[in-house]
Amino acid sequence: MLQQDIEIVNKLGLHARASAKLTQMAGQFASEIWIERNERRVNAKSIMGVMMLAANKGSTIHLEIDGADENEAMQALAALIADRFGEGE
C-alpha cells in the first residue's frame, strides 16, 4: 500500500472538470484508490465522492493506493495533480 499527501495547486481546486479527469485516470488502474481530506474518505473512482471533498487550491489531500499497479497509479495521479489537471493555472 502506498500513501502520499498532495497539495491541490490548480486555481479552481477539485471542481467538476478536474474531478472528472482524476476519476477517469483512477479508473484506468486495478488498484483500490482512496482520497481523504478533513477526515472524509472517498473512492477516487467516484466522481461524486471526489467532488464532495470540496478541495480548494492549497488544500492537502491524502492519497492511499493498494493493488498490483499501485506504483503506476500513484505516479500518474500525482503527476496529474502537479500538472494542475492540464488547466495551466
Task: Give, region by region, the residue ranges found by the protein language model.
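Compact, glycine-rich, soluble single-domain proteins
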Residues: 7-57, 65-66, 88
